[in-house]
């Protein structure tokens, strides 16, 4: 908990100089709670499941986000987007099966709860699209750090080292402030169903990095990545077709 508190605190401080106007309202407060809960359940889930299992369970998020966006935002989702998300998720399953799956019931429950709150804070990012993304993320990360500090044990111990500081800065800046800002910024411009399917690109990029580092990548993992990208392509295909029809309509009037 203390490590997560530091991660959120540093991520929020990094964004503060770029925030136009700090705002705190009910929705931003709820966003902070949802983000904190998602991170907490994800971290605790990893104590019981392998990263491959966590990937399968966490990436049910788009499947949860679609009904939530309909319920909370009244957003409409096309059949093409749903098909793309289902195909993308099947790619995650194929990818993870090649890593080995040994499910733990408590791990399943914790990671699925993480996916639910991930979907929920994603929907709330979209709901808050009228606010400055930098300000929203700075406030929600700083609030989240207070929650984590409150939940941290009074007595704790960890060993300072250069590697620890490098890891902390990495997860705080790139994996914290910047990643939340980019996710929020995408949700300002496109519907939840359009953005969430892009999350399937994360395992693909991670695998590409592993390949560059010399980590063994088997054919099954590559097949899973191909299916993920197929899902992303299909989910965004309808938008391209609609643009093409508009352009053609202009020229043929």
From Swiss-Prot:
The chain crosses the membrane at residues 2-22, 28-48, 53-73, 80-100, 101-121, 138-158, 162-182, 214-234. It is a multi-pass membrane protein. GO terms for cellular component: plasma membrane. Keywords: Cell membrane, Membrane, Repeat, Transmembrane, Transmembrane helix, Transport. Disulfide bonds: none annotated. It is found in: Cell membrane. Induction: Aerobically and anaerobically induced. InterPro entries: AA-Vitamin_Transporters, EamA_dom. It comes from the Archaea. Residues 1-97, 116-237 form the EamA domain. Pfam families: EamA. The keyword Metal-binding does not apply. Belongs to the EamA transporter family. This is Uncharacterized transporter in sor 3'region. It comes from Acidianus ambivalens (Desulfurolobus ambivalens).
